Amino acid sequence: MKRFCVILLLALSSLTTSYAQSVIIGEKLPDMNLRKYLMDFQPEQTPYTCYLFYHSKSELCKRSLTAIKPLIKDANAQLGLVIITKEEYEDAGVTLTEHLDDYISVAFDLQGRAFRSVNVNFIPFCIICDHKRRVLWCGNAATLTQNVLDKILTTK
């Protein structure tokens, strides 16, 4: 009876599997239609771009941003960061203004198109892609290390 219950539980859990993001390493990132940037400050063109899906009230998002900022600065203009939020300027703009620089920008996704285009179901979520928009890495930016980033930036 116990074996039957375990098999039944496994079968039911496989039917209700929740899907995370639909981003696949090596495939092209869908167009996210980012149009509205904080202070109209669009990111500099860089060989690699990191997209960080963000919410200003989330402590995990704040930690993720804090962890990735030094990596962006150490990338020597090879990697730009676009912070994407579904929040209004009044909610997120003020707190995110301090993070703006030549290689860090904030995009407002008020209708959630960017979140939907890559099926973001949890935040913080981060995607690194090359200039052809080919996905090279995805996950929580807080787990990205300098060694992993170096491999991403040096692999052709």
What are the roles of these predicted feature ranges?
Residues C5-S14:
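Bacterial N-terminal signal peptides
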Residues S18-Q42:
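N-terminal "domain-start" segment that seeds a small globular fold
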Residues F41-S64:
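Short active-site neighborhood of thiol/selenol oxidoreductases, capturing the structured segment around
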Residues K62-H99:
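Structural microenvironment flanking redox-active thiols in thiol-disulfide oxidoreductases
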Residues C129-K156:
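Thiol-/selenol-based redox modules, centered on thioredoxin-like
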